[in-house]
């Protein structure tokens, strides 16, 4: 059974999970700073990196319970998946459920987190 996780906890969980599966990934801090103009691209995922074996770009957006994906984030993930990258959306949808959606090559696969196994399983 999953318990409520913060965005930071979900991010760490996904960085560890993807790293164990051959991905070189890191947190992409893309936050606005008070008093400074935003310099960057809107919609870039919270976690970015690449597959060590194939060199494929990987992007994973994290959403804690109650958060929603922005139009810019949706567009970025869609374009990444259509361009041959692996785009992911990891979201906690209830206190018990963490869902991972992977969009790659025009196809979406949905997985659920198994806390006891520390593993996602396709649903």
Which ranges hold each PLM region?
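Catalytic phosphate/metal-binding cores of nucleic-acid and nucleotide-processing enzymes, i.e., regions
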Residues: 1-123
């Amino acid at each position: 059974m999953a318990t409520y996780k913060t965005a930071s906890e979900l991010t760490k969980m996904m960085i560890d999970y993807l790293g164990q599966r051959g991905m070189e990934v890191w947190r992409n801090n893309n936050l606005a700073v008070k008093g400074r103009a935003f310099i960057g691209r809107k919609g870039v995922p919270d976690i970015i990196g690449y597959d060590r074996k194939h060199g494929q770009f990987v992007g994973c957006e994290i959403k804690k319970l109650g958060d929603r994906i922005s139009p810019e984030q949706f567009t970025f993930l869609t374009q990444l998946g259509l361009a041959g990258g692996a785009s992911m959306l990891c979201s906690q949808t209830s206190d018990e459920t963490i869902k991972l959606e992977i969009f790659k090559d025009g196809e979406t696969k949905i997985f659920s987190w198994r806390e006891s196994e520390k593993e996602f399983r396709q649903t």
